[in-house]
Regions:
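ABC nucleotide-binding domain signature
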Residues: 2-3, 11-19, 140
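ABC ATPase nucleotide-binding domains
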Residues: 20, 25-181
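Residues located in well-ordered beta-strands
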Residues: 169, 181, 195, 244-246
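Non-catalytic connector elements of ABC transporters
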Residues: 202-314
Length: 314
């Protein structure tokens, strides 16, 4: 697109700061891009423009499109208000409306929800998802919020230091991360990690336990064993193959609970269980930790792991 003038790219931006005209009403803010694109400088004059037949017809078309967009965003009741008289959510919807009314080929949204409080962010996120489904317009949405990205995206591109590390569907990123940074980025709220020295051979020896991790088989170097809190379970301490852990503390999160357990190898792991079961545990209790070897990952110290499939690149 470098050779295409910005005015000819047919892109619409939505900014974090809204960038609304403070002296214009919500209606005029939404209509602004249409007025600038479809009316000449003479036709935009309040008195003379009203006398020109072509301008009258185009103004009628602009009004129709603004009101259609307003209805879609549920802004009809505030069209006559200026930005200072609008709530944060209403301002954000006006900014969305200003981008949508043009019907561009691509939307570019740069953290448009960052200035909203938590409840309003979730509500507006749902509205954006609904609008995207109804309009079907390609949208590039920049965010540092993992939950926001997963909720809104068909595909996510994860970047670190200006470099794209992985592109995939949200579920595939969570299930099959390309490297440790991607796995950490999608950790909600925790990722269990354990440094492992190589060579690995036929499995990982952790304390008195032998763990077979398919990713690690045959590795000639060390790295990091990683797994999510839901990919391990607390079992009887004498279960074969289980790591020995001791309950340090418990955090409750609604119907779930997170158990922080100190392992014999000097690491602390976090395991997700039901809140009901957590009530039967006590601090200092000795238990076994059974890691799901099919869902754990081994990340070599020299870079990306060998993923189990390459559907992320399709």
């Amino acid at each position: 697109m470098d050779a295409v003038a910005p005015k000819d790219r047919d892109l619409a931006f939505v900014f974090q700061s809204y960038a609304l005209y403070p002296h214009l009403s919500a209606y005029d803010n939404i209509a602004a891009p249409l007025i600038m694109r479809e009316l000449t400088s003479v036709e935009r004059l309040p008195v003379i423009g009203a006398l020109l037949p072509g301008a009258v017809q185009r103004n009628r078309s602009i009004d129709e499109r603004v009101r259609q967009t307003s209805a879609l965003l549920k802004l009809d009741a505030v069209l006559d208000r200026r930005p200072a008289a609008l709530s944060g959510g209403q301002r954000q919807r006006v900014a969305l409306g200003r981008a949508m009314v043009r019907k561009p080929k691509i939307f570019l949204m740069d953290e448009p929800l960052a200035n909203l409080d938590a409840a309003l962010r979730i509500h507006t996120r749902s509205e954006i998802a609904r609008l995207h489904k109804e309009m079907g317009t390609t949208t590039l949405f920049v965010t540092h919020d993992q939950a926001e990205a997963a909720a809104l995206s068909d595909r996510i591109a994860i970047m670190f230091g200006g470099e794209i590390r992985q592109v995939a569907k949200p579920a595939d990123l969570y299930r099959d991360p390309a490297d440790l940074d991607v796995a950490r980025f999608l950790a909600q709220p925790f990722l269990n990690e354990l440094a492992v020295t190589g060579p690995i051979g036929g499995g990982l020896t952790v304390g008195n336990s032998r763990i077979i991790i398919r990713d690690a088989l045959g590795s000639r170097e060390g790295g990091t064993l990683a797994f999510r809190p839901e990919h391990a379970s607390l079992v009887c301490p004498d279960q074969p193959g289980a790591l020995q852990v001791q309950v340090a503390r418990i955090e409750y999160a609604g119907t779930d609970a997170y158990v922080f357990a100190d392992a014999e190898v000097g690491a602390q792991f976090v395991i997700r269980i039901t809140a009901e079961r957590a009530q039967s545990l006590r601090g200092g209790e000795s238990l076994g930790l059974d890691i799901d070897s099919e869902k754990a990952w081994f990340f070599p110290s020299n870079g990306s792991r060998q993923r189990r499939d390459h559907s992320w690149a399709a």
